[in-house]
Amino acid sequence: MGTEEKMTRSDIDLNEPAFYNNRELSWLAFNERVLEEAIDERNPLLERLKFLAIFSSNLDEFFMVRVAGLKDQVKAGFNKPENKAGLTPKQQLRQISERNHQLVQLQDRVYTETIIPMLSQHGIQFLTFDELSDKQRSFLEKRFDHYIFPVLTPMAVDAYRPFPMLLNKSLNLAVVIKNKESDSREQLAIVQVPSVLNRFILLPCEDGKNQFILLENVISYFIEKLFKGYTVKSVSPFRITRNADLPIHEEGARDLLREIEKELKKRKWGAAVRLEMQEGLMDPNVLKLLLDVLEIHKNDVYSLQGPLDLTFLFKLYNRLIVDYEHLTNETLIPQPPEDLIGETNIFDAILKRDIFLHHPYESFQPVIDFIATAAEDPQVLAIKQTLYRVSGDSPIINALARAAENGKQVTVLVELKARFDEENNIQWAKKLEKSGVHVIYGITGLKTHSKITLVVRHHNDEIQRFVHLGTGNYNDSTAKLYTDMGLLTADEEFGIDATNFFNHLSGYSEKPQWHHLSTAPFEIRDTFLDLIDQEIECHKQNGNGHIIAKMNSLTDKPIILKLYEASRAGVRIELIVRGICCLRPGIPNVSEHIRVFSIVDRFLEHSRIFYFHHGGDDKVFLSSADWMTRNMEKRIEILFPIYQQSTKRRIIEILTITLLDNMKAREQNQFGQYRYVKRNPSEQPVQSQLTFFDMASRFSDSEAE
């Protein structure tokens, strides 16, 4: 290394903003990758439709939480740059608005110019009133009179009746009317499009096609029926998004459950952060009024050619897949886990060896069976579990309730602060309490995000402890859609760690000394930093330093700085980060040995895996935590090692195959841009998610033979 290069390297300030991606803009880049899936012609048509809905749903939450938070900072006069890319809240809002308008316009074009015409080719059509037959018009008028009209409530806006407080994410019609009998000025009324009614209406059609019309179009057409004696001058559809981040004051709350219930009611009425309208249909005077009443800036107005709120496409997808299965992905059935083939009793199987689970390729059912069996087993004394997000009719909740009714000691930490699942979790908490479960409502100032279950069993005068640790939620619905990993073990020291973990959550004990676990908000960041430091030392000695880390998001600056340090030392680093990534790879003398990949495919990549070559003595860890500051400091998380060699080999193979993906993988360049990984003509196509399903199916089939 020359003197000049040495000087260049030592002079580099790793805090330079150019070495980082802004968190919010990086998230928008992720949502752009979601939109790319709607554009990708290799995806079946109805799957592309669903990705448009996912893009919209993601964006709603982004505005309700992230944009709303930045706006609150600006209102409070906070102008300090964030600690990575160095952007102030105002600068972030400006760049978010600019990029978002581009992406929303692209989504709008994809829907109106690509997806809708392609649906029409398959006999799926969305019609306007001009395109309806007389029979269809007659059908809709009856439908309106009998089913829609009774649900509608026109809300006049005048000196005595102020502008109504409109619900978050509600679709509304601003109706300008004029009295037929007088020369009085025009008046305004608001009609909310009822969310209790289906957004699309199937029309009678004699040629076998599936023809639909949107609910707001029907209401607009017959709207004069709501305003007898008035002429309707204009109908302007619009939608507002509000601040929905809950400011929970935990320190002063005597009852956290009641405090959250109280704040949930306010969520519907937060400050407006976005206004969406349909191009060509918005009355200019109405727009001016909306901007004034909602206190919204013009930069926060989004004008679309197509319909507002494409999240209705989720329901349309579910309606169409019955008749158009050929336009969807092939159904993939989760297989029996490799480690449980031939086993009949879950506890006997775990006593033989650690059980590794790879969802959704391997079924989530063994996790449900683990808890359900424990609930009925007379030898089980206690069950303890953390719950962050669960499904609507959760078999796990039912099993826990049954266990308590069977006289077992059941303790469940239900995280009431799981964003947008608060209401659901409150209901489950109440149900569990009624069944006799001891429910803990989270920890003050922290979210319990760890995924852990402890079953204590009495057998042959001995106490056995069985532990499940995972990267994903105890949610049987999302377990079919998210990629996650889990471990079932009867290792005595893991059992002791699990016992101490739950005692720490439920009581007043100091942080325990762990045998194997690392936890947040305590030592988890230090553990990661130490592991990277060890890899740097191994590389200096052996020249083969290698780190592979897979996660949802990477934002934590101390970890990014340590990764830059490792890269500068020559350690090869491969990161698989689905969402936000504030680290920039490939920067000379900073991150030139780091590569960053993102996979967006039919399943949501959710597993957190950490591999360190460690001079040939491979170290593998799984975790509930991403490399995000909130996971390090504001959540209760668990990092756990994998010791069983066969499981280690499987996880390393999974990481290797993921890095070979040349169908759905994108790679980030040094400027923060993502591009599809290019496949050479000589290379075999690798779509890692399908490869994992093939592997699970082949193993299951071979064992069955």
Curated annotation (Swiss-Prot):
Coiled coil: none
Catalytic activity, reaction form: [phosphate](n) + ATP = [phosphate](n+1) + ADP
Keywords: ATP-binding, Kinase, Magnesium, Metal-binding, Nucleotide-binding, Phosphoprotein, Transferase
Molecular-function GO term, any one: polyphosphate kinase activity
Cellular component annotations (GO), alphabetically ordered: polyphosphate kinase complex
Cofactor(s) listed in the protein's UniProt record: Mg(2+)
Residue positions binding ATP: 58, 482, 578, 606
Pfam families to which the protein is assigned, alphabetical: PP_kinase (PF02503), PP_kinase_C (PF13090), PP_kinase_C_1 (PF17941), PP_kinase_N (PF13089)
Residues reported to bind Mg(2+): 389, 419
Database matches in InterPro entries: PP_kinase (IPR003414), PP_kinase_C_1 (IPR041108), PP_kinase_middle (IPR024953), PP_kinase_middle_dom_sf (IPR036830), PPK_C_dom2 (IPR025200), PPK_N_dom (IPR025198), PPK_N_dom_sf (IPR036832)
Record-stated family: Belongs to the polyphosphate kinase 1 (PPK1) family.
Function: Catalyzes the reversible transfer of the terminal phosphate of ATP to form a long-chain polyphosphate (polyP).
PANTHER family assigned to the protein according to its UniProt record, in alphabetical order: POLYPHOSPHATE KINASE (PTHR30218:SF0)
Name of the protein in its database record: Polyphosphate kinase
Organism: Halalkalibacterium halodurans (strain ATCC BAA-125 / DSM 18197 / FERM 7344 / JCM 9153 / C-125) (Bacillus halodurans)
